[in-house]
Swiss-Prot record:
GO cellular component, one term: cytoplasm
Species of provenance: Micrococcus luteus (strain ATCC 4698 / DSM 20030 / JCM 1464 / CCM 169 / CCUG 5858 / IAM 1056 / NBRC 3333 / NCIMB 9278 / NCTC 2665 / VKM Ac-2230)
Gene3D superfamilies associated with the record: 30s Ribosomal Protein S19, Chain A
GO molecular function list: rRNA binding; structural constituent of ribosome
Pfam families: Ribosomal_S19 (PF00203)
One GO-annotated biological process of the protein: translation
InterPro entries per UniProt: Ribosomal_uS19, Ribosomal_uS19_bac-type, Ribosomal_uS19_CS, Ribosomal_uS19_SF
Family: Belongs to the universal ribosomal protein uS19 family.
Protein name: Small ribosomal subunit protein uS19
Keywords tagged on the record: Ribonucleoprotein, Ribosomal protein, RNA-binding, rRNA-binding
Job of this protein: Protein S19 forms a complex with S13 that binds strongly to the 16S ribosomal RNA.
Lineage summary: Bacteria, Bacillati, Actinomycetota, Actinomycetes, Micrococcales
Amino acid sequence: MPRSLKKGPFVDQHLYLKVLAENEKGSKNVIKTWSRRSMIIPDMLGHTIAVHDGRKHVPVFVTESMVGHKLGEFAPTRTFRGHVKDDKKGKRR
């Protein structure tokens, strides 16, 4: 069930303040965050936000099509190594 429109998007306060500070300065420095639950808002457009995936920070460049999604959607936490291939042709009994 989506969030109520009257509540508005959720953005962690510390992340929002960092984005506003970068907008005031007019600079586009990388902003590090652990807040995967924060929603991408139009104020973040053009910024690179380094989202923590559990072991490192993944840089995410925010574009217009990302607005309304959460930051964690763009930093995968699991790595898929592939299934083990059964090589039955090469084995002899």
